[in-house]
């Protein structure tokens, strides 16, 4: 066990040094917690919120048509109850369970240029007292957990795309050709993503399986582009940046295990895990947000765009003019692998 701990720690330190170099400008492991956010966990990880509330609806007393008319078609976020009640994931997924089933699977790290870490090392990291003090904790954000060569592919059978979100115009491209669209997200308390909007004008649903997650969301056009923003993730953003934006309209909500957030296209958002958390999320395109996706793809992925338009046929109309559109390509400039 001592040897395992040594190897695990050394691997983590090597991996972290690479992905944190740009963010922290430091490669010395002892400095990863020198800011000392962990000393303020009681305040940072509290249930107190400051923004506008979010609507809560249930699949048991809301129809899909009602959801689409009130939320999807009006670009209004909401929290949905009951979508994951029957998922096997709600009973089986945990950090321990993943370690038992996929110890040697290499999961993608968030904000790490596709760097990967064997799950057993990540599990050690999450449970090691030393690393739980990190100012910017490691965060899994894996878009290819469903690859046929991965042991983690079985996770696809343990949840299902909610019926309200089963339409996706990108599906026609096939899983190998379409932009990344589904992610397993896992991280310890204090981890999270930076302020961003989801890529290519997509909307998203996000179901929290384990833990508790805080979301702060700003409407489209609140910010001109990500270039004007500080991009510190998780606790760092909430401590240093959030106070600057509290006068802007925003939604501040805590997502509990089993709840599903609907995040419309164009909404800026930042997250922080208040507890060790695991979530599943997918991005999608429907008639409600297809124009935003077209406006982005023509600039970001022109080859894929024209192939997609051709395959869609009469379902969408090709648009080559984007000079006077509502959402500029600069606004929709997020990478394809932003993390929530």
State the predicted function of each range.
Residues 1-260, 270-340:
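N-terminal accessory scaffold of Fe(II)-dependent oxygenases
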């Amino acid at each position: 066990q001592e040897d395992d701990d040594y190897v695990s720690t050394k691997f983590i330190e090597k991996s972290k040094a690479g992905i944190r170099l740009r963010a922290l400008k430091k490669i010395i492991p002892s400095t990863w917690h020198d800011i000392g956010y962990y000393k303020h966990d009681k305040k940072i990880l509290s249930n107190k919120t400051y923004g506008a509330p979010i609507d809560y609806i249930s699949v048991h007393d809301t129809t899909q048509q009602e959801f689409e008319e009130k939320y999807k078609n009006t670009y209004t976020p909401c929290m949905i109850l009951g979508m994951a009640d029957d998922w096997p994931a709600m009973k089986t997924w945990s950090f321990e369970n993943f370690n038992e089933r996929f110890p040697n699977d290499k999961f993608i790290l968030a904000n790490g240029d596709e760097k990967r870490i064997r799950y057993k090392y990540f599990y050690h990291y999450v449970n090691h007292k030393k690393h739980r003090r990190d100012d910017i904790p490691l965060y899994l954000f894996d878009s290819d957990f469903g690859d046929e060569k991965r042991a983690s592919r079985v996770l696809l059978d343990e949840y299902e795309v909610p019926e309200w979100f089963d339409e996706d115009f990108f599906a026609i491209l096939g899983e190998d050709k379409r932009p990344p669209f589904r992610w397993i997200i896992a991280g310890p308390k204090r981890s999270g993503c930076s302020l961003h909007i989801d890529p290519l004008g997509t909307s998203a649903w996000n179901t929290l399986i384990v833990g508790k997650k805080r979301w702060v969301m700003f409407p489209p056009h609140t910010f001109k582009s990500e270039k004007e923003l500080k991009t510190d993730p998780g606790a760092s953003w909430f401590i240093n940046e959030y106070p600057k934006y509290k006068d802007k309209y925003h939604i501040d909500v805590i997502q509990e295990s089993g709840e599903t957030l609907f995040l419309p296209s164009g909404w800026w958002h930042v997250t922080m895990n208040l507890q060790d958390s695991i979530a599943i999320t997918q991005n999608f395109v429907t008639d409600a947000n297809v124009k935003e996706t077209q406006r982005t793809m023509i600039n970001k992925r022109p080859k894929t765009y024209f192939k997609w338009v051709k395959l869609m046929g009469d379902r969408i109309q090709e648009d080559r003019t984007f000079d006077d559109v509502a959402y500029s390509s600069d606004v929709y400039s997020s990478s394809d692998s932003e993390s929530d």
